[in-house]
């Protein structure tokens, strides 16, 4: 493992140098809004969608839990939406991210009935279908990874993949069995290198659906890289060789979200 340690250190050093240089970049990551179904600007659906987005940006939104879902209107103009903030972040950071994503939503997806927006701190999602309590792993995928492989040696790559996968799978089990559907890991690979991981599902999923979603998410990541993340609308996974989450808040979980969705009229 000694040669693997040196490769980890070398690539991590070069990555952290570039990471610090881009620390001030916007926290927007990606979005997905297919043109399969659309709406017109002055339609009932448009009004309902704006009502839903306004409720997410209001003072009464569930920023303290980091998760909220809302349904507005009646079929065929019914809109269902949710936001999910990263589980280690404060209500203030959650609020800022949700407000920012709401403000940009109709600019990025001006006429699509279905959309998901990925940010560093939160996810915003809405649809004309019932998206609550349903794990989505067949659309809206987004993968981001470091370009550096952990080592040019295949044996060392295989060792690293086993370590990452086993630790991330453990985190997935813990998340699936928690009320917040969120978990982190911190594992010392060597005296000099530590693996950090984070997994999260929307809390409306069952334990089984959350675990299934996270397992697929972990398997979709290129685990030979020195860092990667994968997003679906229902769950996401990330691992790095540097600390990227707020460790001080992990030990004090927020209260679980309400069991049933709220409804804005």
Curated annotation (Swiss-Prot):
Cellular component per GO, a single term: secretory vesicle
InterPro entries given in the database record: GNK2, GNK2_sf
Residues in Gnk2-homologous domain copies: 27-131, 142-244
Keyword flag Glycoprotein: yes
Compartment list: Secreted
Assigned keywords, A-Z: Glycoprotein, Receptor, Repeat, Secreted, Signal
Keyword Secreted carried by entry: yes
GO BP terms in the entry: programmed cell death; response to salicylic acid; systemic acquired resistance
Induction: By salicylic acid (SA).
CDD domains in alphabetical order: Gnk2-like (cd23509)
Sugar attachment sites: 35, 60, 69, 153, 177, 246
Leader sequence segment: 1-23
Protein family (similarity comment): Belongs to the protein kinase superfamily. Ser/Thr protein kinase family. CRK subfamily.
Record's protein name: Putative cysteine-rich receptor-like protein kinase 9
Source species: Arabidopsis thaliana
